[in-house]
């Protein structure tokens, strides 16, 4: 089995559910800037690759990658690419509806819904993705053996693409939507027990 192509999965989702970035008020965050050096006859040539995330803090988020000989053009390319790879994720009261595990190469990311007041318990490249998505309460864990932000962000998007809304789950199972919705609220509105 080959490596998942997250960009292709996002493009397939956009065919079903198109998102126009011009209609959204998007915020941008740069996750990583890498400098690579190529040695040529006259010395060294530098190029920069940037990983950026965009989101509207209301259920829409995207990531992109850009390369250029200078930092500002690589950031601009990454942001433009991120706007092409936007997805919509169903949120319930500031958290995700259910547990999900995303995988990409050696990166494995676990996302779990959390009660109100927990905050975004995430580190590294996972935090900007979830903050720009609009998640206010979530528990995360990077399980895989990787420190590569590119793979980690793609693993987060693999997890986000697996999230289903209560309506979608009810339609798949052929059950009453209210029954599903009641189970989804276990995490979101349960009182904190001391």
UniProtKB/Swiss-Prot annotation:
Keyword ATP-binding: no
Residues spanning the signal sequence: none
One protein family per Pfam: Ribosomal_S5_C
Stretches assigned to the S5 DRBM domain: 26-89
InterPro entries: Ribosomal_Su5_D2-typ_SF, Ribosomal_uS5, Ribosomal_uS5_bac-type, Ribosomal_uS5_C, Ribosomal_uS5_N, Ribosomal_uS5_N_CS, Ribsml_uS5_D2-typ_fold_subgr
Organism expressing this protein natively: Persephonella marina (strain DSM 14350 / EX-H1)
Subunit structure of this chain's protein: Part of the 30S ribosomal subunit. Contacts proteins S4 and S8.
GO cellular component: small ribosomal subunit
Annotated HAMAP family: Ribosomal_uS5_B
Record carries keyword Translocase: no
Any one GO molecular-function label of the UniProt entry: rRNA binding
Keywords: Ribonucleoprotein, Ribosomal protein, RNA-binding, rRNA-binding
One GO process term, biological-process aspect: translation
Protein family according to the UniProt entry: Belongs to the universal ribosomal protein uS5 family.
Job of this protein: With S4 and S12 plays an important role in translational accuracy. Located at the back of the 30S subunit body where it stabilizes the conformation of the head with respect to the body.
Domain notes: The N-terminal domain interacts with the head of the 30S subunit; the C-terminal domain interacts with the body and contacts protein S4. The interaction surface between S4 and S5 is involved in control of translational fidelity.
Cited PROSITE patterns: RIBOSOMAL_S5, S5_DSRBD
Protein name in UniProt: Small ribosomal subunit protein uS5
